[in-house]
């Protein structure tokens, strides 16, 4: 079973669009333990060495929601950190240190919208792992 307290999002920049911020806040109410860190740049040294690092990038691998659930469950009790870059993406040196490059879709999304989609998918993954009826395949 996945819990939000094992998952963190590290993102470059703050959400400027009110409707996206409101959407993220709706999911945060359902997952108050989910940590979302917004900053001007990534400091990979602040992420513990034994944590799993997943970079969201267009060249990453795509998964269905159930496949992503299985993948995250395989990380057992490790903390999982999702990294989302700004409009320029994630620097290659950080991608090189990640455990997985993840693509949300073959479509390209603005980074703010990608953050909302990721938060929804995290909620969905937690719901799937808990047997909640939220996800209907």
Curated annotation (Swiss-Prot):
Cross-referenced InterPro entries: Alpha/beta_knot_MTases, RasGAP_dom, RlmH-like, tRNA_m1G_MTases_N
Key words of the record: Cytoplasm, Methyltransferase, rRNA processing, S-adenosyl-L-methionine, Transferase
Domain of life: Bacteria
EC number: 2.1.1.177
Principal cellular location given in the protein's record: cytoplasm
Subunit structure: Homodimer.
Protein known as: Ribosomal RNA large subunit methyltransferase H
Organism: Prochlorococcus marinus (strain MIT 9515)
